[in-house]
Amino acid sequence: MGYLLPGLGWLPGGPFAAGRIGFLLAAWLWVGALHTLNANRQRPAVSATVASVFLFSHVLYWGFLSFLAGWVAFIAWFLLHDRMPAGRLTWRRAILFFAAGALLYLTHVLWFLFGVGWLVVDGLRRRLGVRELLRRALCLVPIGALAAVWFPSIVHRGFTSATHWPPTFAARFSPASIADAALGGIRGPLEPALLLGVLLWIGIGIWQQRRAGRAVWDGRLLLLATLYFAAWAILPSKANNTLYFAERWLPCALATLVIAAPAPRGGSGLRFVPALGLTLFMAGTTLLWHAAERTSLTGIDEVLASLRERPRVLGLSFVQNRIFKGDPYLQTFAWVQVARGGELNFSFADFAVALVVYR
């Protein structure tokens, strides 16, 4: 699925517009799935607006399109599991369950594993019974068998690295580390201020309705958010060739927590605050993106035009960007291969992350 979105962007805009259109499609799907979940659980609409800010996380900035698409697939899985009644598993229901599991697997194997975990945990919470859980799990056996055959064949492609854990407790749970895992795309005070505002929003809602108890919470979404938080807290930061193994779950956890928690009570003015805050944040982010492109990518078209056909290219990236965290230009030299063909000294496409393998 991570290849499908830029592929759809390639059709109308060509290779140089494929990335932008693909990310736009991913953003629409991510936010649309979030609002669908919010509406299905009958939560306040303003909660989905607040939760939408977590689209702009390091997952987006690092280009983990498959993981973004997996969020959409998992919400479909969540809703199917929620609406499928316990009892006799008909062929139609079994096919639907298999199709939803296959969609999870084809987007990202981590989401497939998480989906299986949610099937068990939520099934036990709902007291579906062992037989019903086994019936549903049996629908996923062909997918699990495919994963067992496929994964060993590609695990050693490209680069591998040792499993990495944070060296200290503070390395994961300090305020700075939490802010980087929750958003982590842009340098400066913009993202920490936004995260603080979201946490304040959650806190106000909880405080205002503290006497209502569990009635104002969505218990299933709170359980889901807890599983996301657990994945962020206990998983390694890096495993094999999977970067941000733990951190990628925190934006999902916070977005789900915002929907699960009670929204603050107040007049229309208070409900206007999240929309205004999201608009200002998106405007600031857009200006920073534009500034980065104008200052860091000036002349790239001329450079590509000056190269011969099918060159051999060595890509080097040593300078930290003053706007973005991470390394947004790590693969900029890959545009040479898109425009002129040839060979690169390194490409993330060299190792398989899905059923598509680059040779």
Describe each region flagged by the PLM:
Residues 198, 259, 263-288:
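Signature aromatic-anchored transmembrane alpha helix within multi-pass, membrane-resident enzymes
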Residues 43-46, 90-93, 136, 212-226, ...:
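Membrane-interfacial loop-to-transmembrane alpha-helix junctions, especially the N-terminal start
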Residues 293, 303-359:
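Short periplasmic/luminal acceptor-recognition loop of GT-C membrane glycosyltransferases, typified by
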Residues 240-266:
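Hydrophobic/aromatic-rich transmembrane helices and adjacent perimembrane loops
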Residues 3-4, 11-29:
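Loop-to-helix entry region of an early transmembrane alpha helix in multi-pass inner-membrane enzymes
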Residues 1, 95, 99-221, 233-248:
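Transmembrane catalytic cores of multi-pass membrane glycosyltransferases
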Residues 24, 28-37, 44-85, 93-122:
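Membrane-embedded helix bundles of polyisoprenyl
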Residues 239, 282-305:
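Hydrophobic alpha-helical transmembrane segments in integral membrane proteins
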